[in-house]
């Protein structure tokens, strides 16, 4: 499964969840709560197999974070080999990706936009430019927008919007200085994800 580059709204309709985690996409899903295409409203009448349910759950989570199959499986295998609850550890590893942290801090409006900002060199980690979206953020790391990028229209708009939203509890954010700190790992109850990670564990354990 490669990284999806088409319409995030259309893919969200197909998966049945708001993959962009934006109000705009959610409003669209509320109006059209069925898969795209001429047969979208008639889908889902047959009972899916256990395999297809688990495959779909894996695809939903991978697409939510914008991770390709190789990266996704590598992270899962890492999570399965460290102490702790595998599903929670797996989600924490996904949350620690730099592109995701940039999104959580509100510097970008979507994870896709966050990947672009990181790749184009607009993001600093502890004062140093990092252009790798999969870079793993550590507890205590300070993430900021490069000074020369703070005047960009998109980033200005994103930070104004973030001031009206609740900041994730594992993050400290100073919108006025375009700076945030990753203060702790998120607990499972912190993550309001419409995902059953146990299905993903079962998928890879088959």
UniProtKB/Swiss-Prot annotation:
Renumbered residue ranges of the record's region Disordered: 28-52
Report TM segments: none
What cellular component terms from Gene Ontology apply here? small ribosomal subunit
Q: How does it assemble?
A: Part of the 30S ribosomal subunit. Contacts protein S5. The interaction surface between S4 and S5 is involved in control of translational fidelity.
Q: What is this protein called?
A: Small ribosomal subunit protein uS4
What UniProt keywords are attached to this protein's entry?
Answer: Ribonucleoprotein, Ribosomal protein, RNA-binding, rRNA-binding
**GO process terms (BP):** ribosomal small subunit biogenesis; translation
Q: Which gene encodes it?
A: rpsD
An example of a Pfam family matching this protein is: Ribosomal_S4
Q: Which Gene3D superfamilies match?
A: Ribosomal Protein S4 Delta 41, Chain A, domain 1 (1.10.1050.10), RNA-binding S4 domain (3.10.290.10)
Show the GO MF annotations: rRNA binding; structural constituent of ribosome
Explain the purpose of this protein: One of the primary rRNA binding proteins, it binds directly to 16S rRNA where it nucleates assembly of the body of the 30S subunit. With S5 and S12 plays an important role in translational accuracy.
């Amino acid at each position: 499964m490669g990284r999806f580059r088409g319409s995030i709204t259309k893919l969200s309709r197909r998966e049945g969840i708001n993959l962009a985690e934006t109000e705009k996409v959610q409003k669209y899903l509320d109006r059209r709560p069925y898969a795209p295409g001429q047969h979208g409203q008639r889908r889902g009448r047959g009972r899916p197999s256990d395999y297809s349910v688990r495959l779909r759950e894996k695809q939903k989570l991978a697409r939510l974070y914008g991770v390709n199959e190789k990266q996704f499986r590598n992270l899962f295998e890492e999570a399965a080999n460290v102490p702790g609850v595998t599903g929670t550890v797996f989600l924490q590893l996904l949350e620690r990706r730099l592109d995701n942290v940039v999104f959580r801090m509100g510097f970008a409006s979507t994870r896709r936009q966050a990947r672009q900002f990181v790749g184009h060199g607009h993001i600093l980690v502890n004062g140093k430019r990092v252009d790798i979206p999969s870079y793993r953020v550590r507890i205590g790391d300070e993430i900021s927008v490069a000074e020369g990028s703070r005047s960009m229209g998109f980033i200005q708009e994103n930070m104004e919007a973030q001031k009206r939203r609740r900041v994730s509890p594992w993050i400290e954010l100073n919108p006025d200085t375009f700076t945030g700190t990753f203060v702790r790992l998120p607990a499972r109850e912190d993550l309001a994800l419409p995902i059953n990670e146990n299905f993903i564990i079962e998928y890879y354990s088959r």
